[in-house]
Amino acid sequence: MATIANPRDIIIAPVVSEKSYGLMEQNVYTFFVSTDANKTQIKIAIEEIFGVKVASVNTVNRAGKRKRSRTGFGTRKATKRAYVTLREGSDSIDIFNGSVA
C-alpha cells in the first residue's frame, strides 16, 4: 500500500447529485476520490479531514464515456466514487455549507 502524505490528495470533491443528497439522510456520504486510492486510504483520509469515525467504505470505478466530436472519438476521464458510511453516533459531515479548513 503506497502512502500518500496529504489526505486531500485522495479526496477530490463531494458528489453533488440527487442520489447523494438522499443518501446523506442515512449517514452515507459520496465523494470523488483518486483512482489509485484503496478503501483503507479513503477511510483514513475522511477521518483526518472531517474528524469523524467511518464504519465502511464502498467504491465504484466508472469508465469514461466515449464521446464523439466532428474530428473523431474521444473519451472522458474515468472516475472513482467512494460511498462512506459513518458510525452510529458520529457527527455528520457538513460538506455543502462552506469549506473545511
UniProtKB/Swiss-Prot annotation:
One of its GO terms (biological process) is translation. Keywords: Ribonucleoprotein, Ribosomal protein, RNA-binding, rRNA-binding. The gene is rplW. This is Large ribosomal subunit protein uL23. InterPro entries: Nucleotide-bd_a/b_plait_sf, Ribosomal_uL23-like, Ribosomal_uL23/eL15/eS24_sf. Part of the 50S ribosomal subunit. Contacts protein L29, and trigger factor when it is bound to the ribosome. One of the early assembly proteins it binds 23S rRNA. One of the proteins that surrounds the polypeptide exit tunnel on the outside of the ribosome. Forms the main docking site for trigger factor binding to the ribosome. Pfam families: Ribosomal_L23. One of its GO terms (cellular component) is ribonucleoprotein complex. Belongs to the universal ribosomal protein uL23 family. GO terms for molecular function: rRNA binding; structural constituent of ribosome. It comes from the Bacteria.
